[in-house]
Each structure stands twice: as structure tokens, then as C-alpha cells.
Amino acid sequence: MLACIEICPEEWSNRLMITELWVSDNLQLQGIGTHLMNLAKEKAKEQGRRVIILETQSCNVVAISFYRSQGFKLIGFDSCCYTNRDVERHEVRFDLGFFLDNSSQAIKP
């Protein structure tokens, strides 16, 4: 596999969750991740979703930088998602969100 994105609708909250985004190391920085994100954004708009959400780890600086470049903002964190020592281990779960234009909280990238 060279790249993939997995999305999951949350009906009760009208959100679209990105549960997996992966691009092979040798194909990174070629626009593939951006293309996959644009597909997710298009799907979210088609479905009338209000926000796209995803999670990453505080130690994954490359992913955080990429998501921010795609217009995602920090919307929360969980300091004990993985272990009871997440903060000590510098591996806190970050929740990020991209608000769609049809939302009253629209954020333009």
C-alpha cells in the first residue's frame, strides 16, 4: 500500500472523523497527503458535516504541522488516553478539528 485515508461519519454529532491517514515514507512531501485530506473535506461537505476531527500524539510534530497546514485547529487533548503516564512520556493525545463553511464556527485555512 502506498497511501490511505479512512473516514468514519459520526451521525449523532454530525462530524466526520479521520481514523487513519498514512502515506509511505518515500512518497511523502509530494502532495498525496494533501490530496487525501481534500477528498475527506469534499466528502464532509457532500454529507453536510459541520466539522472533521482527528487525533494525533503531542510527540508527532510532523503530523501536527501537516494538519495545521491543512487548516486544522487544536480542539482538545487527553492526558491519560494511552497510559497513566502520558504527560511524563510526552505522548498526550491531541484532538484537532477542521470546521466546514456550513458551520457557524467556520475557520478558513
For each of these PLM feature ranges, what is it?
Residues 1-19, 24, 37-38, 80, ...:
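Acetyl-CoA-dependent GNAT
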Residues 10, 46-47:
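Alpha-helix C-cap/termination motif
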Residues 13, 61-62:
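Short alpha-helical
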Residues 23, 29-46, 65-69:
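Conserved acetyl-CoA-binding loop-helix of GNAT-fold acetyltransferases
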Residues 28-29, 51-52:
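A generic structural signal for short
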Residues 44, 53-56:
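Alpha-helical transmembrane segments of multi-pass integral membrane proteins
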Residues 50, 57-61, 70-73, 80-109:
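C-terminal "cap" of GNAT-fold acetyltransferases
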